[in-house]
C-alpha cells in the first residue's frame, strides 16, 4: 500500500491540503474539495494510506510566501503529476503563464498546437492535481468570464486579484 504524506494548512482562501510522495508534491487542493482529492488519488494509486506530515517539502512556507506575493516561491517545489500526454502538455503550458496574466481556453489550445481542442484543454484544466502551483486559475473563458474552477469561482477570482502586479 502506498504511503502518502498529507498536510493541511490555513490560507486566506481556506484550508489547503498538500499530498507528497517520493519527495515530490503530487496533489494540492482545498480541504472542502476532499471528494475530488480522494477520487484523483484513488484513480492514481488504487490503494494508499494517508500519513499526517508537518510541512513536507516546505510547502507551507512556499504557499505562505506566495500569499505574501513572492511569485518565485513555487520554484523550489518538485512536482510529480500523472496524466495523459495531452494533460501533461496542458499542465506544463499552464506553468508558463506569467503571474498576473490570463489567457483563454482557446488561446491555450492554440499555444499547444491543438486549436480545435478547446474542450479537451478545459477538461485537462479540470483534472489539474496541483492547484495554484500549476495555475489553472489563470485560464478564463474567451468572453473574459471566470468560467469554472474546481476550488470554486470565488477562489479563482481571489487568486487572480491577488496576482495583479
Label each PLM-derived region with a short phrase:
Residues 1-115, 165:
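Basic nucleic-acid-binding alpha-helical/helix-turn surface characteristic of O6-alkylguanine DNA
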Residues 77-79, 121, 146-149:
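Short clusters of hydrophobic/aromatic residues that line enzyme substrate/ligand-binding pockets
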Amino acid at each position: 500500500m502506498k504511503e502518502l504524506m498529507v498536510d493541511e494548512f490555513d490560507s486566506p482562501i481556506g484550508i489547503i491540503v498538500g499530498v507528497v510522495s517520493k519527495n515530490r508534491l503530487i496533489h494540492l487542493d482545498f480541504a472542502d474539495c476532499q471528494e475530488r482529492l480522494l477520487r484523483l488519488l484513488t484513480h492514481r494509486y488504487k490503494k494508499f494510506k494517508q500519513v499526517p506530515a508537518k510541512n513536507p517539502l516546505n510547502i507551507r512556507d512556499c504557499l505562505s510566501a506566495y500569499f505574501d506575493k513572492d511569485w518565485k516561491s513555487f520554484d523550489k517545489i518538485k512536482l510529480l503529476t500523472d496524466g495523459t500526454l495531452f494533460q501533461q502538455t496542458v499542465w506544463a503550458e499552464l506553468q508558463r503563464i506569467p503571474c498576473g496574466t490570463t489567457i483563454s481556453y482557446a488561446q491555450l489550445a492554440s499555444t499547444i498546437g491543438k486549436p480545435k481542442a478547446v474542450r479537451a484543454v478545459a477538461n485537462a484544466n479540470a483534472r489539474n492535481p496541483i492547484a495554484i502551483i500549476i495555475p489553472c486559475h489563470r485560464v478564463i473563458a474567451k468572453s473574459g468570464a471566470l468560467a469554472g474552477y474546481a476550488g470554486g469561482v470565488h477562489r479563482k477570482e481571489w487568486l487572480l486579484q491577488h496576482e495583479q502586479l
